[in-house]
Amino acid sequence: MRLVVDGFGKYLGIENGLIVVKEKGKALRKVRPEDLKQVLIIGKAAISSDAIKLLLKNRVDVVFLDFNGEILGRLSHPLIGTAKTRREQYLAYGDKRGVHLAKEFIKAKMANQMAILTNLAKARKDSNPEVAESLLKAKKEIDACLNELDGVEAEMIDKVRERLLGIEGKASKHYWDAISLVIPEEYRFNGRRGIEIGSPRYAKDIVNAMLNYGYSILLAECVKAVELAGLDPYAGFLHVDVSGRSSLAIDLMENFRQQVVDRVVLRLISYRQIKPEDCEKRNMVCQLSDNARRLLLASLLERLDSKTQYRGRNLAYSSIILLHARDVVAFLRGERRYEGFVQKW
């Protein structure tokens, strides 16, 4: 279970061994700590030190976010795993394992982009054949990028990172140019902005604000998975090391952007559940209204906890993310080959 504590005046404490959310002294909700897997503290909500201790004792992930979805920090149980895992992670940066992982992360992202475009095209085959044709054309362009990616080989990631990112960037441009065709004009979406930064504070329109908020929530889930698997979240392969940036978690996240975030955002827009007027412009930057932000967050968490068939099992997306973090560990330790997460629907 995930617990969201959102808004000024909300307070999370403990009472008779239970986690309790209060507002103006009145208990709004009580939860057993052992039933929780994550707590999200948003904006100016507060938490007591006793609650923090109880949550950490029960290995509950605690994430602090601002109102824009920016991750301010995390509290988690002391790291698990073995020193061998991290040694292999650092060594892989200088050999072919790092190249293989980077390529698999990008391959999965491109394959999932093509799956999204295929589904969107099928839905418009009769109602808007011209747009459907454009979507399928973009899919073919991404497929060509996949073929180009297959030809990239090197002894270490530093020798091919720029080339890999160039191919990934080209594929993403085809993807977002196509996605813009299915988003109503009133949303004023002209493609991704601030991709490199990936921060909600750089969004100029409501679609980018929604995407960036969603990717922040997904990143928090990936950081948790990477740490639970015993990996160093800051030592990535595809994304370079930057102080304070969880590069490996961002690498892992490439597997899940489309299936966890993009689908949710496109659905909310398609049903007009979040509208252009839910964008509040401040200093030329779009900030989601409180109602839109809460609806988006609830939809994202529901998606993370929803189940799908994967490897013959009915698994939540959050469980699949953890499974893939552990797959990375198994690959680094020479136990089996790593393959990215791809879902055809």
Swiss-Prot record:
The keyword Manganese applies. Pfam families: Cas_Cas1 (PF01867). GO terms for molecular function: DNA binding; endonuclease activity; metal ion binding; RNA binding. Keywords: Antiviral defense, DNA-binding, Endonuclease, Hydrolase, Magnesium, Manganese, Metal-binding, Nuclease, RNA-binding. Its EC number is 3.1.-.-. Disulfide bonds: none annotated. Its cofactor is a divalent metal cation. It is an enzyme of class 3 (hydrolase). GO terms for biological process: defense response to virus; maintenance of CRISPR repeat elements. It comes from the Archaea. A divalent metal cation binds at E168, H239, E254. InterPro entries: Cas1 (IPR050646), CRISPR-assoc_Cas1 (IPR002729), CRISPR-assoc_Cas1_C (IPR042206), CRISPR-assoc_Cas1_N (IPR042211). Belongs to the CRISPR-associated endonuclease Cas1 family. Forms a heterotetramer with a Cas2 homodimer. Homodimer. PANTHER family: CRISPR-ASSOCIATED ENDONUCLEASE CAS1 1. CRISPR (clustered regularly interspaced short palindromic repeat), is an adaptive immune system that provides protection against mobile genetic elements (viruses, transposable elements and conjugative plasmids). CRISPR clusters contain sequences complementary to antecedent mobile elements and target invading nucleic acids. CRISPR clusters are transcribed and processed into CRISPR RNA (crRNA). Involved in the integration of spacer DNA into the CRISPR cassette. Acts as a dsDNA and ssRNA nuclease, binds to linear and circular dsDNA and linear ssRNA and ssDNA. This is CRISPR-associated endonuclease Cas1 1.
